[in-house]
Regions:
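Active-site neighborhoods and metal-handling regions in enzymes and metal-associated proteins
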Residues: 1-457
Length: 457
């Protein structure tokens, strides 16, 4: 833990902008044309983009429409107006999407026992959109697989597609067009999308900061979660907050259990484009920690912070995912730390789009990528965990200038975070790295002292 210490630090009050940046309406048509070009290069003559409530990011990225209560499916040909299949409840909402679409009411996407008397069979709708014998159909849901014939859509849709194209056609997984970790269309973001993500990170990180400032023994989990101040924006994952024995599982929702002094504690708050997470113990000092883990900071938090600080410092355009993985392996490779997921991944409207980080990865980081600092120890011991999960983006000189010009207030917040990380925490960032979180790598292991954080300064 050389160079790492606990210190009292004053977090800058960066705040949350009142208005959320919006994408220009024409951006959706531009994205569709970009996807059409990639589809043609890959040999597809039709694309099918499927969405349900949890997996709507691809569809929302392309159309500005995400289904509520039911599923939806976009059919995209090489030219013409895209077609959208929706159930009963999304009919009106799809018609108001920023991307003009030809709507088809497909009532099997509706909830159970709702009317199903006003839609054509799926095969007729798809055939009417140009899918037939010999068609080469690319299918997008939310996962790419090593085998292109593996498709995560409901079987009845895939069966119908394969029946329509016949033995001379093909139906294959095309998710890489949007989410390939090196150059997927949804992996490389423009300035307006990054500004939206910065706003989202202001919301989630300020919420977690407010929670840490108001955390106290006796507060129920269900009361504590209200401190996050969720503003109604669509969530990128369910809200997580647990204390005590249940916190071990990490992913659970809050209960009515009162939070007790000495509890282990974790919370995560994510909306489209951002997620912020912190974890530690509900104490003010090491003397209040549970028996046997008085060295919690030295054994776990200090090495973890040193690893994440080096990971941050290694970020720049052109860096490889394999190098980032090697940093974490060198610091936290001991089985005690229990690191088993990719140490870092890309994010978008969905919390985890893909990851360029794995052992030996030669995928290079690029300008426009939005990344999540997601490095989570799972010790499986009384030491529990620690977490410093925040969002950043990578931007070359041109994109940085564009952001500073178009969104000067966001740029000022980014510069304030960079100064805080360098001056207060001792984390020097490459100019390419834009921190989006108002917590800006602040890691308090003793959660009743949110001003007492790890630092290299």
């Amino acid at each position: 833990m050389t160079g790492v210490r606990l210190a009292t630090v004053e977090l800058p009050d960066i705040g949350v902008p009142v208005e959320r940046p919006e994408l220009p309406v024409e951006r959706y048509a531009e994205r569709v044309e970009g996807l059409r070009a990639r589809a043609a290069e890959a040999g597809f003559d039709r694309l099918v983009v499927y969405a349900d409530r949890e997996h709507s990011a691809n569809l929302s990225f392309l159309t500005g429409f995400d289904p509520r209560f039911e599923e939806a499916m976009l059919v995209l040909g090489p030219t013409g107006t895209p077609a959208i299949l929706v159930g009963n409840e999304c009919w009106g909402m799809a018609g108001a999407a920023p991307l003009p679409m030809e709507r088809h009411r497909y009532q099997d996407f509706s909830l159970p026992s709702q009317p199903r008397d006003r839609s054509l069979p799926l095969s007729e709708i798809l055939a009417g959109e140009g899918i037939g014998r010999g068609s080469r159909v690319g299918v997008l849901g939310w996962k790419a697989y090593d085998r292109p014939d593996r498709i995560e859509l409901p079987a009845y849709i895939v069966d119908e597609l394969r029946e329509l194209v016949g033995p001379t056609g093909s139906v294959t997984n095309a998710n890489a067009l949007l989410i390939d970790p090196a150059d997927g269309l949804r992996i490389i973001n423009d300035v307006d999308q990054l500004a939206m993500f910065e706003w989202a990170s202001c919301v989630t990180s300020s919420g977690v900061r407010r929670l840490l400032g108001g955390l106290r023994p006796g507060l129920r989990e269900s009361e504590a979660v209200g401190l996050l101040g969720w503003n109604g924006m669509p969530l990128s994952c369910h809200v997580m907050l647990t204390a005590g024995p249940r916190a071990t599982f990490g992913l659970l929702s809050p209960s009515d259990r009162p939070i007790e002094r000495g509890d282990q504690f974790t919370t995560a708050f994510g909306i489209w484009g951002a997620l912020t997470c912190r974890a530690g113990f509900v104490v003010e000092e090491a003397a209040e920690l549970p028996d046997g883990i008085g060295d919690y900071v030295d054994r776990l938090v200090g090495p973890y912070f040193a690893a994440v600080a080096e990971w941050y410092g290694a970020l720049h355009i052109g860096q490889t995912g394999g190098t980032l993985q090697a940093i974490i392996d060198r610091h936290l490779g001991d089985p005690f730390f229990g690191i088993f997921l990719n140490p870092g991944h890309q994010l978008h409207l969905d919390e985890w789009v893909n990851s360029p980080v794995w052992p030996g990865s030669t995928v290079e980081l690029r300008s426009g990528m939005a990344m999540q600092v997601d490095i989570i120890p799972a010790t499986g011991t009384p030491y529990f965990t620690t977490n410093i999960e925040d969002g950043i983006a990578l931007a070359d000189e041109t994109l940085r200038a564009e952001l500073a010009t178009a969104y000067p207030e966001a740029w000022a917040r980014i510069e304030a975070r960079r100064r805080f990380m360098a001056d207060a925490l001792g984390i020097d960032l490459h100019p390419d790295v834009l921190p989006f979180s108002n917590l800006a790598a602040a890691l308090p292991p003793f959660l009743l002292r949110p001003d007492l954080v790890m630092t290299l300064a």
